[in-house]
C-alpha cells in the first residue's frame, strides 16, 4: 500500500484539523474542548475509543486480521503565551483566537497527524493486522496527565508491543525525518529555593546576615559539583537561571530566591546530582546560619531514550515513506518530554518530523511566538505514523525490552514528582 499517497489524499483534512486546533488552543490539563473534538472525529471514522478523565483519549483501530498491538502517540495541549501574527518574514495562515494561549510547540500538528493516520488506517482496516491504539495525551506541558492514561491502561490490562511517537522540528526541513537509537529528550530536574537571613543596613553587615553570601557559596559549589561528578563526554547541563534579592544598594536583604534546571540522559546520575546538591544547600545554610525553603524540588524526570531495535524498525519505515536520502540521525535534545514516562513501560521511539521552511520564514524554534510550521509536515508525520502501524503489525518482530516492574506510583516517587491533581468536572 502506498501510504504516502493515502495520506496525501487526506492532507486537506489534516490541514483543516490543525487550523481548528491552532485557533482554539487549551492549556495543559484543561483540554476539554480539544478532547470533544478528537472524540467526534474518531466517531466519524467508526473508531472505538475511551475518553479517560484527566488523561486523554485512546482510540482503537482493530484490523480484520489477527496480529500484534502497536500504539501511536500524540500530545494535544498548548502553551500559556501570546502568539505573533507573523513568523518574522510573512503573515501566518492561522493564529490563536484565545488571548494568552498558543500552540507554539506544534501539538496541534501532532494531533492532526494522528487523526489523519487513524482515518487512513480505519479506511483500510480490512488489510490491517492486529490493533492500533491511538493515544492522545493531555497535559504534556507540565500537566502530568500521562499518569492517568497509563494508570487506566495498567488497571484494565491495555497493553502494546511497541509505541511510536514523533515531534515536529522546525529546525529540520519539511520532507525529512530524523530518528536514531539512544538519547532523544532529556530528563529534567527543577529547583526553586528561598534563603532567609537577617536584614539590616548595608554599612553594618556584622549586624545582619546577608543571604547573598550563602547563595554565592552554593552557586560556586553547584558549578563545581557538575565538574566533579559528571564525565565530560556525558550530555549534562546544570544552570541557575533566576536570582532575586534586595531592594536598594544600602539595604542588606532578608531573603534571596534562586531557581534553575538540570538536564541529563542518565537518570541515575540525575538522582545522585540532586542528592548532593541538596547537601550543598543545607550545609551552606548551616554554615551561614540561613534558613532554607525548597519551593520547588522536582525530578529528574524520565529521559526519552529510543529503544535500539524499535528505532531501527522506525527508521526503515521512515525510509520506506520518504526515501533513505531524507532520513537522518536525530540530534539529542536537552528539552524535557513527558513521553519518557511511557518509555518506562513500552519499547518506544520518538522521531523528529521536519516542519521547517527557510524560504517561507518557517524556522522559528519551538516555544517561540514566531513558530510557524510548514503544513506539508502533516503529510509526512501522518504517513510516518501509518507506516509504523502497518509495518509493525505485519512483521514478526519482538523487541528486547524490560519494562518498569513496580507500580506507576513508585516511578513517580523515584522522580520526586507528585501525583497530578484531578481537574476534570
Regions found by a protein language model. Give the residues of each.
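Histidine/acidic-residue-rich, glycine-tolerant segments that coordinate divalent metal ions
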Residues: 79-81, 92-102, 108-109, 121-242, ...
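Divalent metal-coordination and catalytic microenvironments
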Residues: 21, 59, 72, 107, ...
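Non-cysteine beta-strand/loop elements that form the S-adenosyl-L-methionine
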Residues: 71-73, 82, 191, 350-355
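Acidic/His- and Gly-rich active-site-bordering loop/insert found
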Residues: 1-103, 108, 112-129
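Active-site beta-loop-alpha junctions enriched in small/polar residues
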Residues: 26, 75-77, 139, 169, ...
